[in-house]
Amino acid sequence: SRKIKLVAVYTKINSQNISYIEKNFNLGKINQYHGIKKGIENTNYLIKTKNKKYILTIFERRVQVKDLPFFMNLMSGLSKLSIKCPRPIKNKKGIYLFKIKNKIACLVTFLNGKEKNELSNKECYVVGKNIAKLHKASKKLKLYRKNSLSVRSWDKILNKIDNRINRLSKNLKTSMKKELFQIKKNWPNNLPKGIIH
């Protein structure tokens, strides 16, 4: 198995940024904050007040800013439907998203838990059961976002693959293009749609 190096504090914040959050959100005084190194895509900080904990997420390069309102509304809606997920916090103006260090950020509630490197069969069952609850609950939400990882985006991904991939197998890129053509040609258009994770 391959280990991924986790360095998820790309953007460093300071006391001025913390003061901005205290001033613009109804959290109370922030007593402590520190970066969370576990993760790979965005910068995350654990923020502690006297009685509560929050997560500050600073969105980094790969995130499409236009998609963020969808995710804020999804988490908020799921939370209201009793799905255990982070709930985004609105600022005093009623807005979820704000800027820190010229990057979009948000605050969400903290969920207790710990990471698991291996799951038992029983734990896998519980995960599946909770994902099913998420799927059912999300049908009640009137939210839609085009799937940026579906078959329609695979051409773009394939075009980014350098011809050096042919070192793995002769004409691999060409055969991948042929396979993708067949997949797209036979892709069913009437599949059910819904929120997935």
Q: Which residue ranges define each predicted feature?
A:
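Asparagine-rich low-complexity intrinsically disordered tracts
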Residues: 1-5, 159, 178
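Juxta-kinase regulatory segment immediately upstream of eukaryotic protein kinase catalytic domains
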Residues: 2-29
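Generic structural marker for isolated residues within well-ordered, non-membrane alpha-helices
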Residues: 18, 75, 180
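Short Pro/Gly-enriched beta-strand edge/turn motifs at strand-loop
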Residues: 23-31, 176-186
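Protein kinase glycine-rich loop
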Residues: 34-38
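Active-site acidic catalytic loop and adjacent metal/ATP-binding pocket
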Residues: 40-50, 55-56, 88, 181-197
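ATP-binding pocket architecture of kinase catalytic cores
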Residues: 49-143
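A cross-family kinase active-site recognition segment
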Residues: 118-173, 191-193
